[in-house]
């Protein structure tokens, strides 16, 4: 997969797997766990600020969010939110169903369950929690799962409330919808025992399987999220948030290792050049006059804003380093730009390693060096075009990041991009953001609770695989696909419902082969929900359609949502063929092709079968057609 030798780099990876639980109500109120797309009649506004922790400290990540000075607006759909989400009413008692799932999951991972659970408040003031904190409860610690022959430590399992959904964002305002706020979420955190990208995928898959095997995991986009903690020898611990897809995990790890290795190379080069943090000046220079007559559209636009100008900092000894690629499509200059955007709120930066470009001419670059007194042979210049206050804050952040570059890799929280690269998000949060939830009494884990939870402990994936092959008659490959599928719980329910009517292999194939195939063909499979699948299988079980018609029926329903299955069957002409009709069609096919049949006896079956299937495909079981054709040909060709 990669040329990186991960054992030499000393790679350590820890996973945090977050999965929404499919419970009837939210974690601390009676509201249903349903997302609402209806127009919200209630909208309210909040401004959030950080509070000091129990030891009098303010978390630096919370401080960053506060400095953005954002207004937060909240849409409150009445069907899935109440005064608890609006932080106008104390939380109710914890959802016991969610607690039981968490206890069962902890047991399945050999964890030590805490006998007295205290709900905590974790400070979050990015607006995603109306109260400014997320309620979270530590359920269990110190467990493990097996990856091949190796133990992977499971450090903690927490039960917490999910955040609100971000709907829109502008420069001054963020808008959220609070229907998702409070949905129960389990967070499983592994120890940093993972040492290569493929192992990380296996471990994430296994934890995800265990959660799904409880039968209580929600499905759909956004219901599962992986965060990664990654470090290498000589580098730093970096948290990467929001890896949505399993297949991206290995790529994110590879690209983060590459980034840290490149940053260490840049550090070594800076040291070699004699650069130290102390000689990186934070002197910000107004260079607006250099660009008064610029042809750059971006700079012109900035200068047209009242108070707009162009400002610069000189990075002594950095020439050529800002253009070094540290991840595919991202350079060291991209890292500086991330800091400028987050801390200054600007759109981006220019730097001399990429100029002349973007309408900025060679003459303007030369004038820039003259104006700042920088050495064109060894120095780099970073410029920002914006109002002075924002530009100054952005360039201060650039200088701070440049100083860190001389030391090495910074500890930080980064966001995953869809291509597996990452961007700076905020400093790593400290321990100062957690304090007790005083509105919820301690929860005591009694033998009665553990007895209830024991009924939800998932069967290990290995045993489930063996069962599907032995009892359900699935191939090993198909059984593995089912266990890895998000509709695993649906599969088990449908197998039980259609026992003796539809083979388990047909149900499995519908879920893991047919539906993904339709997606690849451009069919809008988001319109195929559990009810649609069940309706189609009902039609198969009741002999209204043959199993061969399943793809066509699902495709038609997906393209015409709201249309009844009976109408679809009628429009597609998929009514089941009777045995007498089949016999008649076989006789007609034989009569029509008698000359070919007698001339090519060895191909007689293919000739007749092909002719008959033109008329009955999707309307009767192909195996039955084949059986009837063979019987008829046996009579004729004696």
Curated annotation (Swiss-Prot):
GO terms for molecular function: aminoacyl-tRNA ligase activity; ATP binding; glutaminyl-tRNA synthase (glutamine-hydrolyzing) activity. GO terms for biological process: glutaminyl-tRNAGln biosynthesis via transamidation; translation. It comes from the Archaea. InterPro entries: Asn/Gln-tRNA_amidoTrfase_suB/E, Asn/Gln-tRNA_Trfase_suB/E_cat, Asn/Gln_amidotransferase, Asn/Gln_tRNA_amidoTrase-B-like, GAD-like_sf, GAD_dom, GatB_C_1, GatB_Yqey_C_2. Its EC number is 6.3.5.-. It catalyses: L-glutamyl-tRNA(Gln) + L-glutamine + ATP + H2O = L-glutaminyl-tRNA(Gln) + L-glutamate + ADP + phosphate + H(+). PROSITE patterns: GATB. It holds the Pfam family GAD. GO terms for cellular component: cytoplasm. SUPFAM superfamilies: GAD domain-like, GatB/YqeY motif, Glutamine synthetase/guanido kinase. Keywords: ATP-binding, Ligase, Nucleotide-binding, Protein biosynthesis. Allows the formation of correctly charged Gln-tRNA(Gln) through the transamidation of misacylated Glu-tRNA(Gln) in organisms which lack glutaminyl-tRNA synthetase. The reaction takes place in the presence of glutamine and ATP through an activated gamma-phospho-Glu-tRNA(Gln). The GatDE system is specific for glutamate and does not act on aspartate. Belongs to the GatB/GatE family. GatE subfamily. Heterodimer of GatD and GatE. This is Glutamyl-tRNA(Gln) amidotransferase subunit E. It comes from Desulfurococcus amylolyticus (strain DSM 18924 / JCM 16383 / VKM B-2413 / 1221n).
């Amino acid at each position: 997969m990669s040329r990186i030798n991960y054992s030499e780099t000393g790679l350590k990876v820890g996973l945090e797997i977050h999965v929404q639980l499919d419970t009837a109500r939210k974690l601390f109120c009676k509201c249903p766990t349903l997302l609402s797309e209806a127009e919200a009649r209630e909208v309210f506004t909040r401004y959030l600020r950080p509070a000091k922790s129990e030891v009098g400290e303010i978390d630096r990540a919370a401080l960053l969010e506060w400095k953005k000075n954002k207004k937060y607006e909240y849409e409150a759909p009445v069907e899935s939110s109440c005064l608890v989400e609006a932080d106008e009413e104390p939380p109710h008692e914890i959802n016991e169903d969610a607690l039981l799932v968490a206890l069962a999951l902890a047991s399945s991972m050999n964890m030590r369950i805490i006998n007295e659970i205290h709900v905590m408040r974790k400070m979050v003031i990015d607006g995603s929690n109306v109260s400014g904190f997320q309620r979270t409860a530590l359920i269990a610690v110190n467990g493990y799962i097996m990856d091949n022959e190796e133990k992977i430590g499971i450090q903690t399992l927490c039960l917490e409330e999910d955040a609100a959904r971000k709907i829109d964002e502008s420069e001054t305002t963020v808008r959220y919808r609070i229907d998702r706020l409070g949905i129960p979420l389990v967070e499983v955190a592994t120890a940093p025992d993972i040492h290569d990208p493929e192992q990380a995928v296996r471990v994430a898959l296994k934890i995800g399987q265990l959660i799904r095997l409880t039968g209580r995991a929600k499905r759909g986009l956004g219901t599962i999220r992986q965060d990664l903690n990654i470090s290498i020898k000589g580098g730093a611990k970096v948290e990467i948030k929001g890896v949505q897809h399993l297949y991206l995990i290995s790529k994110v790890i590879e690209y983060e290792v590459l980034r840290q290795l490149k940053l260490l190379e840049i550090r070594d080069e800076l040291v070699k050049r004699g650069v130290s943090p102390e000689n990186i000046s934070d002197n910000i220079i107004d260079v607006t006059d250099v660009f008064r007559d610029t042809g750059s559209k971006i700079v012109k636009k900035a200068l047209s804003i009242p108070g707009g100008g162009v400002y610069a900092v000189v990075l002594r000894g950095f020439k050529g380093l800002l253009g070094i690629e540290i991840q595919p499509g991202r350079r060291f200059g991209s890292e500086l730009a991330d800091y400028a955007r987050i801390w200054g709120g600007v759109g981006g930066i220019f730097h001399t390693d990429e100029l002349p470009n973007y309408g900025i001419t060679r003459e303007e670059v030369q004038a820039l060096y003259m104006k700042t007194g920088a050495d064109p042979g060894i120095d780099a210049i970073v410029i920002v075009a914006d109002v002075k206050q924002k530009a100054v804050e952005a360039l201060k952040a650039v200088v701070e990041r440049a100083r860190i570059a001389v030391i090495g890799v910074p500890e930080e929280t980064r966001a995953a991009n869809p291509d597996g690269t990452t961007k700076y998000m905020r400093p790593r949060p400290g321990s100062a953001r957690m304090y007790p939830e005083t509105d919820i009494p301690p929860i005591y884990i009694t033998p009665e609770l553990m007895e209830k939870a024991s009924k939800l402990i998932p069967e290990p994936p290995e045993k489930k695989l063996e069962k599907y092959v032995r009892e359900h008659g699935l191939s090993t490959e198909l059984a593995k696909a089912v266990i890895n599928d998000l509709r695993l719980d649906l599969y088990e329910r449908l197998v039980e419902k259609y026992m003796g009517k539809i083979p388990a292999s047909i149900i499995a194939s519908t879920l893991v082969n047919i539906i993904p195939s339709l997606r690849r063909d451009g069919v809008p499979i988001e319109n195929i929900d559990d009810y649609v699948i069940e309706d189609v299988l009902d039609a198969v079980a009741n002999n209204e359609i043959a199993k061969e018609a399943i793809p066509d029926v699902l495709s038609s329903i997906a393209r015409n949502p709201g249309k009844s299955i009976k109408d679809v069957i009628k429009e597609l002409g998929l009514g089941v063929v009777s045995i007498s009709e089949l016999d008649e069609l076989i006789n007609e096919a034989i009569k029509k092709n008698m000359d070919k049949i007698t001339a090519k006896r060895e191909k007689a079956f293919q000739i007749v079968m092909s002719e008959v299937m033109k008329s009955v495909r999707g309307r009767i079981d192909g195996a039955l057609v084949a059986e009837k054709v063979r019987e008829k040909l046996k009579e004729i060709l004696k």
